[in-house]
Amino acid sequence: MSKYWSNITKDIEPYVCGEQPKNKKIIKLNTNENPYPPSPKVLQAIENAAKDDLRLYPDPNCDALRKTIANYYNLSKEEVFIGNGSDEVLSLSFLTFFNPEETIVFSDISYSFYPVYANLYKLDYKLAKLKEDFSIDINDFKNARGGAVITNPNAPTGVYLSLDSIKQILEDNINNVVMVDEAYIDFGGESSVSLIKDYPNLLVIQTLSKSRSLAGMRIGFALGQKELIEGLNRIKNSFNSYTIDRISSLAAIEAIKDEEYFKECTLKVIKTRNWTINELGKIGFKIIPSKANFIFITHDTYQAEDIFIKLKDENVLVRYFNKDRISNYLRVSIGSKEEMEIFMDKIKKIINKL
């Protein structure tokens, strides 16, 4: 610990990312990346963008990308905010809408960046305990004085919350912002975007990292009524006016436009997810129902940590969380069909030896 650090720096416990191995032979099922490459139209846009214009600053307002996203969701450009990945959008949203003197609410088992943001901005928070099946009790979010954050589908469980439940939470918190983090919504869930016109307190946050295969370009966005987006822009422009570079913006536009490729890839992930769930069930695993591009699994006979270590020895990476209530679960990203066949082969051999 350095004597030059501020008290905030000394006190904060940073978020820990999933492992990013240098060994290309490893089957990477630990960070929920898309197993398929970006759209060919995206790759062509990137190639075309590598020209003299890179000497110029990008559009600080990301107008072209905002228009593309607005058209896709039948919104106005003023209802779209762009950030450097949904993590940045979430961070700026915590700062924009939550007050230190009020308590915000999010689930006890959810995206572990939320408490980091809360601690960084000195926000008080309450953890709403998920039910035994990892579903949300919406009563825990009733009258959350400072606001609420819902991950839908949830991470790391993959559990999906219905739009009716989202509506109830919004109505119970009409004077506070409710953020719905939809990083994984495209793998079987129904987005809350359709509710924006009726709920001025709703902010929907999405990313192009998962379903659009652009994790390496860091593009996220928020959707909400104009008043919310105006607030986000005030905070963004107090940090960094240029959140998205020229190449990322052009790539994102093509990723949004290529609906056929998007649907093709998400459908393949969903089919492979269903196949993997079925195969794991045959060897005694219990799988939490998932609407994400990952599954959350456990076994009554074998310890999750032991399986995690053995899989890593076999060059297969999954995610293990040594935390209360989920220490005997593994989160497994859905790879290509070929990758998941290898995963199944390895895990069968491992449990036969344990």
Curated annotation (Swiss-Prot):
Pathway: Amino-acid biosynthesis; L-histidine biosynthesis; L-histidine from 5-phospho-alpha-D-ribose 1-diphosphate: step 7/9. Its cofactor is pyridoxal 5'-phosphate. The modification N6-(pyridoxal phosphate)lysine is found at K210. Gene3D superfamilies: Aspartate Aminotransferase, domain 1, Type I PLP-dependent aspartate aminotransferase-like (Major domain). SUPFAM superfamilies: PLP-dependent transferases. CDD domains: AAT_like. One of its GO terms (biological process) is L-histidine biosynthetic process. InterPro entries: Aminotrans_II_pyridoxalP_BS, Aminotransferase_I/II_large, HisP_aminotrans, HistidinolP_aminotransfase, PyrdxlP-dep_Trfase, PyrdxlP-dep_Trfase_major, PyrdxlP-dep_Trfase_small. It catalyses: L-histidinol phosphate + 2-oxoglutarate = 3-(imidazol-4-yl)-2-oxopropyl phosphate + L-glutamate. Signal peptide: none annotated. One of its GO terms (molecular function) is pyridoxal phosphate binding. Keywords: Amino-acid biosynthesis, Aminotransferase, Histidine biosynthesis, Pyridoxal phosphate, Transferase. Its EC number is 2.6.1.9. Homodimer. Belongs to the class-II pyridoxal-phosphate-dependent aminotransferase family. Histidinol-phosphate aminotransferase subfamily. This is Histidinol-phosphate aminotransferase. It comes from Clostridium botulinum (strain Kyoto / Type A2). The gene is hisC.
